[in-house]
Swiss-Prot record:
Classification lineage: Eukaryota, Metazoa, Chordata, Craniata, Vertebrata
Basic and acidic residues composition-biased segments: 313-330
Protein name listed in UniProt: Alpha-2A adrenergic receptor
Disulfide bonds listed in the record: C121-C203
List of residues that carry Phosphoserine: S346
Biological-process GO terms, alphabetical: adenylate cyclase-activating adrenergic receptor signaling pathway; adenylate cyclase-activating G protein-coupled receptor signaling pathway; adenylate cyclase-inhibiting adrenergic receptor signaling pathway; adenylate cyclase-inhibiting G protein-coupled receptor signaling pathway; adrenergic receptor signaling pathway; cellular response to hormone stimulus; DNA replication; fear response
Length: 465
């Protein structure tokens, strides 16, 4: 990613980063005093300490948050869905950024020169691009996974196995490596002509136009465009499904499977255990992103854990189903469906306000079913607003963290001057995305919050499980 300004050997590799001599630029890289005296640092002691503290907090928060994500996925029963392996791989990339990249970037920044030699300069910058690119491509893969689970519904969810998810993750890393490593493959011949003696070596970003443009497109602009288009499409589908009430929705509106059962808004099939006909076969209220709004099955569904809103959890399985929803299983033994009551019969053992003749009972049942549909309809409208906000957070944080860096990076390559301080700020601001990913993809999810409580509050573990 970086150009070798000062030739070190005949036939050397064109590196990702350049270990170049930089004489007389004390504001950027520091200088060496005549006679081998003390090096001048680019910042005062107070500023240096502030930068070290801020970068240290960034590294700690990134490692801590992403380690929590990995532990939660592997220890929580509610997070065993195969697609959560995306979050494990994403968290691993962010941890590697915080441990193998940021410390050396910090040292280079506060010391004013590259201390660690040419070989590690190339490795460090290759890893920098690899991990940051893989983090971005992971977000893109997650958005595509959500889109396929909506548009292909049953077919994709049947194919969404751990093996398939792992194959996609490997593909993500291969794409990131292809974007990151081409300069290490090309060999650039340079003469061994004389030049000025090295003063302060520095590891700088590659300014070769072909690589800057290609890496910027592959690392940011293309994944960003894909994410935006995919999330816009997800929002359009969710909005269309909630705009039409369930009672007016045709068989093609939600791609209902045979039998008339509606699919859940996230594209999954009907709720497990719902086997009765008519109003009783209506799926339970669900949120736009696939998480249930009221009762939830004991076993987490594939589409829930990765979603960004509230999701199912085992402690909600015993929650009452509310009016208009007959209980299923053993607890429904004493209940008689209105559709089974013959004309002239009365419902057994009902209270004073219960239905009398079969026609009245059937009418009340239909009225209760209609009220339940209206309630679900209003709930979906409210959840649409929350889902829109979550999508705005996902896309907004991604763009805000990375767009300034890649935009100025491209401007420099085409010859537009950019102040070093501004570019350096954008360079560090991009690292913040690695620490924010756990917040975006976990804090909005109820199962992750409960898993974090289980991890951090061991005394309360039995109740949380």
């Amino acid at each position: 990613m970086f150009r070798q300004e000062q030739p070190l050997a005949e036939g050397s590799f064109a590196p990702m980063g350049s270990l170049q001599p930089d004489a007389g630029n004390s504001s950027w890289n520091g200088t060496e005093a005549p006679g081998g005296g003390t090096r001048a640092t680019p910042y005062s002691l107070q500023v240096t300490l502030t930068l070290v503290c801020l970068a240290g907090l960034l590294m700690l928060f990134t490692v801590f948050g992403n380690v929590l994500v990995i532990i939660a996925v592997f220890t929580s029963r509610a997070l065993k869905a195969p697609q959560n392996l995306f979050l494990v791989s994403l968290a691993s990339a962010d941890i590697l950024v915080a441990t193998l990249v940021i410390p050396f970037s910090l040292a280079n920044e506060v010391m004013g020169y590259w201390y660690f030699g040419k070989v590690w300069c190339e490795i460090y910058l290759a890893l920098d691009v690899l991990f940051c690119t893989s983090s971005i491509v992971h977000l893109c893969a997650i958005s595509l996974d959500r889109y396929w689970s909506i548009t292909q519904a049953i077919e994709y969810n049947l194919k969404r196995t751990p093996r398939r998810i792992k194959a996609i993750i490997v593909t993500v890393w291969v794409i990131s490596a292809v974007i990151s490593f081409p300069p290490l493959i090309s060999i650039e011949k340079k003469g061994a002509g004389g030049g000025q003696q090295p003063a302060e070596p520095s590891c700088k970003i590659n300014d070769q136009k072909w690589y800057v443009i290609s890496s910027s497109i592959g690392s940011f602009f293309a994944p960003c465009l894909i994410m935006i288009l995919v999330y816009v499409r997800i929002y359009q589908i969710a909005k269309r499904r909630t705009r039409v009430p369930p009672s007016r929705r045709g068989p093609d509106a939600c791609s209902a499977p045979p039998g008339g059962a509606d699919r859940r808004p996230n594209g999954l099939g009907p709720e497990r255990g719902a086997g009765t006909a008519g109003a009783e076969a209506e799926p339970l209220p669900t949120q736009l992103n696939g998480a249930p709004g009221e009762p939830a099955p004991t076993r987490p569904r594939d589409g829930d854990a990765l979603d960004l809103e509230e999701s199912s959890s085992s402690e909600h399985a015993e929650r009452p189903q509310g009016p208009g929803k007959p209980e299923r299983g053993p607890r429904a033994k004493g209940k008689t469906k209105a559709s089974q009551v013959k004309p002239g019969d009365s419902l057994p053992r009902r209270g004073p306000g219960a239905a009398g003749p079969g026609a009245s009972g059937s009418g009340q049942g239909e009225e209760r079913a209609g009220g339940a549909k209206a309630s679900r309809w209003r709930g979906r409208q409210n959840r649409e607003k929350r889902f829109t906000f979550v999508l705005a957070v996902v896309i907004g944080v991604f763009v805000v963290c990375w767009f300034p860096f890649f935009f100025t990076y491209t401007l420099i390559a085409v010859g537009c001057p950019v102040p070093y301080q501004l570019f350096n700020f954008f360079f560090w601001f991009g690292y913040c995305n690695s620490s924010l990913n756990p917040v975006i993809y976990t804090i909005f999810n109820h199962d992750f919050r409960r898993a974090f409580k289980k991890i951090l509050c061991r005394g309360d573990r039995k109740r949380i499980v």
